Amino acid sequence: MDNIAILEALLYTSGDEGLEQKQIIDILDINLNQLEDLVSKYHSHGLTIQRYGSTYVLTTKKETSTYIEQLVKEKSKMKLSQAAMETLSIIAYNQPLTRGDIEMIRGINSDGAVKTLIARGLVEAKDVDHSRSHHLITTDLFLNVFGIENLDALPTTEEDEAEMDEFFSNLVNQKGESNE
């Protein structure tokens, strides 16, 4: 069996979490250049291999998005409250942050929202040298959920306002009916 077929099977088995590039390199006994070559050569009818940070995920091609949106429209997998969405936006644009930093920006206790984001795997707490507080950062799952390869792909204030509105509209569309 060739490495492309094995890579496809590995990524399919790993699901939405994907696999870290080091895992793939170790399992297939290849180097980074060979991995990137496999990813660029991968072709399937409706699937592609996408990189989110250092994680590779088997995902659908962009051309299938309208059909998938119809399917997913009724079943939102990741519903978040308005507070959680605000907190996630603050972390995404200003990371790394402590919980205290977030409270200062929002002007309200955000522990519940932070716990929700950590539980959903969108945010993680990292220990920082010379600090007793955990610093919150977004995860590769955050990149995957919002369809961006890295944090540089987040809209900035210099970009077209319509693009910013669309990004935040997508965030708001993910919010649920519950408080956290």
Swiss-Prot record:
Source superkingdom: Bacteria
InterPro entries recorded: ScpB_csome_segregation (IPR005234), WH-like_DNA-bd_sf (IPR036388), WH_DNA-bd_sf (IPR036390)
A single cellular component GO annotation: cytoplasm
Primary role: Participates in chromosomal partition during cell division. May act via the formation of a condensin-like complex containing Smc and ScpA that pull DNA away from mid-cell into both cell halves.
Subunit and partners: Homodimer. Homodimerization may be required to stabilize the binding of ScpA to the Smc head domains. Component of a cohesin-like complex composed of ScpA, ScpB and the Smc homodimer, in which ScpA and ScpB bind to the head domain of Smc. The presence of the three proteins is required for the association of the complex with DNA.
Family listed: Belongs to the ScpB family.
Name recorded for this polypeptide: Segregation and condensation protein B
Naturally occurring in which organism (per UniProt): Staphylococcus epidermidis (strain ATCC 35984 / DSM 28319 / BCRC 17069 / CCUG 31568 / BM 3577 / RP62A)
